[in-house]
Swiss-Prot record:
Superkingdom of the organism of origin: Eukaryota
Catalytic class of the enzyme: hydrolase
Example GO molecular function: magnesium ion binding
A cellular component term, taken from the record's GO annotations: mitochondrion
EC number of the protein: 3.1.-.-
Name under which the protein is recorded: Flap endonuclease 1
Keywords of this entry: DNA damage, DNA repair, DNA replication, Endonuclease, Exonuclease, Hydrolase, Magnesium, Metal-binding, Mitochondrion, Nuclease, Nucleus, Phosphoprotein
Ranges where the record places region Interaction with PCNA: 341-349
Record-linked InterPro entries: 5-3_exonuclease_C_sf, Flap_endonuc, HhH2, PIN-like_dom_sf, XPG-I_dom, XPG/Rad2, XPG_CS, XPG_DNA_repair_N
Signal peptide as annotated in the record: none
Protein localization: Nucleus, Nucleolus; Nucleus, Nucleoplasm; Mitochondrion
CDD domains tied to this protein: H3TH_FEN1-Euk, PIN_FEN1
Species per Swiss-Prot/TrEMBL record: Sordaria macrospora (strain ATCC MYA-333 / DSM 997 / K(L3346) / K-hell)
Function in brief: Structure-specific nuclease with 5'-flap endonuclease and 5'-3' exonuclease activities involved in DNA replication and repair. During DNA replication, cleaves the 5'-overhanging flap structure that is generated by displacement synthesis when DNA polymerase encounters the 5'-end of a downstream Okazaki fragment. It enters the flap from the 5'-end and then tracks to cleave the flap base, leaving a nick for ligation. Also involved in the long patch base excision repair (LP-BER) pathway, by cleaving within the apurinic/apyrimidinic (AP) site-terminated flap.
């Protein structure tokens, strides 16, 4: 899931784009969270015996436990979360989904074998691979969020794309997801590790897209082309093209069209482009995803007072959670929801959008940087060729 090796490229090539900090640094901010990715992470938090958390009736409760307590943690730290759920996947994603299903089938068989003959580590490994977020998981989490007074929306297709739209429109400060492809949908800021458990002690990663483009010396189209070449959910990667090669090819040729033409004309025949590789369609899904516009009435979010008795009924009486813990946590939620109405100081000042002239100047700057990097790559290539052609001992 996501873009292969993208974070390592950003870390190496555009380190200024990444900030790491404590969850408290996000106080007073609204954040759009990729719900499906979060639920998946809650479900794979299995115990050492390979079993998910269940109640006495044998019903899985890992997703509810994670959603309830991780959301409480965010509100405790002054964050106003809203969740975005996946809708129907784009048709181009069907191949990736089929492969995921096949891997889960194989993992299920591996899990049964591991239970018979394997170690605890094998059982846990295969258990994680069999996890799938179902409609029931989503429906129960949506019910829980409604009782908590936390807003949510179901995206027409990809949750990450909807999160990015909300962030660009200023409805939220950032999109939160572990999927790096959220950057391809052009969220200004991506937060990672926001829904991780406190015990993992992982800092919140804040990735700024404008700094990513600046560090890479690319415009948005080149960046998306790089991500497609690295391997995304929509297309298989091209064999023998790793992160270093992908970066070099985009810098040298500028676009995927040019890269593909160069590969086809390569006399050494080093690269085999998959027969069905519609990169233009994949690019269009990143640039023109099916999303609700930010001014849609469904995107008018409100954080409500939690229904304490409803939470006790659902989590304690129906799902087997501790009534005392649910009640005390719900009362704390109610109190924190009231105090979270305080805004950050920056919220009092309206951020003026860039003028068209400023946008054009920024685009020119990125294009100039990209051209400089392309020239540098070509010069290095020529220099290597000269050294190679130079006779030994000369």
């Amino acid at each position: 899931m996501g873009i292969k090796q993208l974070f390592s490229i950003i870390k190496d090539e555009a380190p200024a784009a990444i900030k790491e900090g404590d969850i408290k640094n996000q106080f007073g901010r609204k954040v759009a969270i990729d719900a499906s990715m979060s639920i998946y992470s809650f479900l794979i938090a299995v115990r050492s015996d390979g079993q998910q958390l269940m109640n006495e009736a044998g019903e899985t409760t890992s997703h509810l436990m994670g959603m309830f307590y991780r959301t409480l943690r965010m509100v405790d730290n002054g964050i106003k979360p809203l969740y975005v759920f996946d809708g129907a996947p784009p048709k181009l994603k069907s191949g990736e989904l089929a492969k995921r299903f096949q891997r889960k089938q194989e993992a299920t068989e591996g899990l049964e074998e591991a239970k018979e003959t394997g170690t605890a580590e094998d059982v846990e490994k295969f258990s994680r691979r069999t996890v799938r977020v179902t409609r029931e998981h989503n429906a129960e989490c949506q019910k829980l969020l409604k009782l908590m007074g936390i807003p949510y929306i179901v995206a027409p297709t990809e949750a990450e794309a909807q999160c990015a739209v909300l962030a660009r429109a200023g409805k939220v400060y950032a999109a939160a997801s572990e999927d790096m492809d959220t950057l391809c949908f052009h969220t200004p800021i991506l937060l990672r590790h926001l829904t991780f458990s406190e015990q993992r002690k992982e800092p919140i990663q804040e990735i700024h897209t404008d700094k990513v483009l600046e560090g890479l010396g690319m415009d948005r189209k080149q960046f998306v082309d790089l991500c497609i070449l690295l391997g995304c959910d929509y297309l298989d990667p091209i064999p023998k093209v790793g992160p270093s090669t992908a970066l070099k090819l985009i810098r040298e040729h500028g676009t995927l069209e040019e890269v593909v033409e160069w590969m086809k004309a390569d006399p050494k025949g080093r690269y085999q482009i998959p027969e069905d590789w519609p990169f233009e369609d994949a690019r269009a899904l990143f640039f023109e995803p099916d999303v609700r516009p930010a001014d849609d009435p469904l995107c008018d979010f409100k954080w409500e007072k939690p229904d304490i008795e409803g939470l006790v009924q659902f989590l304690a009486h129906e799902k087997g959670f501790s009534e005392d813990r649910v009640r005390s946590a719900s009362i704390k939620l109610q109190k924190n929801m009231q105090t979270s109405q305080q805004a950050r100081i920056e919220g009092f000042f309206k951020v003026l959008p860039k003028t068209e002239e400023e946008k054009k100047a920024h685009k020119r700057k990125l294009e100039e940087q990209a051209e400089q990097k392309r020239k540098k790559v070509k010069e290095e290539k020529k220099e290597k060729a000269k050294l190679k052609a130079k006779p030994r001992g000369a």
